[in-house]
């Protein structure tokens, strides 16, 4: 499909990313409709996915997304926790509508409920866990794009992108590649320049592991410096009462020394 155009061909750097993220490793079971995407079967029973066909389907899915005039009419869905962060990041960079977490039954078919939506295209992370929106999309003729493993059912799925959708790194990488290809087809970014958004932003992070990393980072920090108390010389305080000379106060008259008159008369007699 993209083999005729060299500009759309799979690059070596992208192949390396897929191999490191174990995108090529499928499950031990194979759905009969997914046999065309299986390259071979390993001795331990794990099926190897053909990454060339994975890339062709990814480019086809990106072209379908770009064909929608209003990007908000494209709904990206992930009920599994490992794909919720990738879905939110994809929606942020492509202006699509995310549904991360539990899907409300009847959102595409029940016009009475407030959560009713009418999307024009769905992109789901796993056909098994996201079976409810896929089923409702089939009732109202909404095309569906899905990341599928070797054992995923392809019922009501229009474009299947074969990959390892059970690995957090693999599913994060696939959403990152799809977002980059959508932006390239829109002309937002150039193919000659590397996309500055790193793929790590699309990876799922376990909350417990994130807390452990933060705690380990705090332990590596140097301890805060404690300022030692400096002994300053204590100045001698002087008693101002001693320096001030006592003022000489005049003699105090004793009022008892005055002669007490015993009569109201002029001579003092009764």
UniProtKB/Swiss-Prot annotation:
Stored SUPFAM superfamilies: Ribosomal protein S2
Broad class of where this protein is predominantly found: cytoplasm
Enumerate the PROSITE patterns for this protein: RIBOSOMAL_S2_1, RIBOSOMAL_S2_2
Q: Please give the coiled-coil regions recorded for this protein.
A: none
Give the Gene3D superfamilies listed for this entry: Glucose-6-phosphate isomerase like protein, domain 1
Q: Where in or outside the cell?
A: Cytoplasm; Nucleus
Bilayer-spanning residue ranges: none
User: Region (Disordered) spans which residues?
Assistant: 251-270
* Single Gene Ontology BP annotation: translation
Q: Does the keyword Cytoplasm apply?
A: yes
User: Which Pfam families does this chain map to?
Assistant: 40S_SA_C (PF16122), Ribosomal_S2 (PF00318)
> According to the UniProt entry, which residue ranges have a biased composition of type Polar residues?
261-270
Q: Which GO terms of the cellular component aspect does the record hold?
A: cytosolic small ribosomal subunit; nucleus
**Could you tell me one molecular function GO term of this UniProt entry?**
structural constituent of ribosome
Q: Which CDD domains match?
A: RPS2
Q: Keyword set for this entry?
A: Cytoplasm, Developmental protein, Nucleus, Ribonucleoprotein, Ribosomal protein
What is the recorded function of this protein according to its Swiss-Prot or TrEMBL entry?
Required for the assembly and/or stability of the 40S ribosomal subunit. Required for the processing of the 20S rRNA-precursor to mature 18S rRNA in a late step of the maturation of 40S ribosomal subunits. Required during oogenesis and imaginal development.
HAMAP family registered for this protein in UniProt: Ribosomal_S2_euk
- PANTHER family recorded for this chain? 40S RIBOSOMAL PROTEIN SA
Family that this chain belongs to: Belongs to the universal ribosomal protein uS2 family.
Question: Which proteins does it associate with, and in what oligomeric form?
Answer: Component of the small ribosomal subunit. Mature ribosomes consist of a small (40S) and a large (60S) subunit. The 40S subunit contains about 33 different proteins and 1 molecule of RNA (18S). The 60S subunit contains about 49 different proteins and 3 molecules of RNA (28S, 5.8S and 5S). Interacts with oho23B/rpS21.
Can you name this protein? Small ribosomal subunit protein uS2
Species whose genome carries this gene: Drosophila willistoni (Fruit fly)
Gene field: sta
């Amino acid at each position: 499909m993209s083999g005729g155009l060299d500009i759309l061909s799979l690059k070596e750097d992208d192949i390396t990313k897929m191999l490191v993220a174990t995108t090529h490793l499928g499950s031990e079971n194979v759905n009969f409709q997914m046999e065309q995407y299986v390259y071979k079967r390993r001795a331990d029973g794990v099926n190897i996915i053909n990454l060339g066909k994975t890339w062709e389907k990814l480019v086809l899915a990106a072209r379908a997304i770009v064909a929608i005039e209003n990007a908000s009419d494209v709904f990206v869905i992930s009920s599994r926790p490992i794909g919720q962060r990738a879905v939110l990041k994809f929606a942020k960079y492509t202006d699509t509508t995310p549904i991360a977490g539990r899907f409300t039954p009847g959102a595409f078919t029940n016009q009475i409920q407030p959560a009713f939506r009418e999307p024009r295209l769905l992109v789901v992370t796993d056909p098994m866990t996201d079976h409810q929106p896929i089923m409702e999309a089939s009732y109202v003729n909404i095309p569906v794009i899905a990341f599928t493993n070797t054992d995923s059912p392809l019922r009501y799925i229009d474009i299947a992108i074969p990959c390892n959708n059970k690995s957090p790194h693999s599913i994060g990488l696939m959403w990152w590649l799809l977002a980059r290809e959508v932006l390239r087809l829109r002309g937002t970014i150039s193919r000659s320049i590397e996309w500055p958004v790193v793929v790590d932003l699309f990876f799922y992070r376990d909350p417990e592991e994130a807390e452990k990393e933060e705690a380990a980072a705090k332990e590596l920090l140097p301890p805060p410096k404690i300022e030692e108390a400096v002994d300053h010389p204590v100045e001698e305080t002087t008693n101002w009462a001693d320096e001030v000379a006592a003022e000489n106060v005049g003699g105090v008259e004793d009022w008892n020394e005055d002669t007490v008159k015993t009569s109201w008369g002029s001579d003092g007699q009764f």
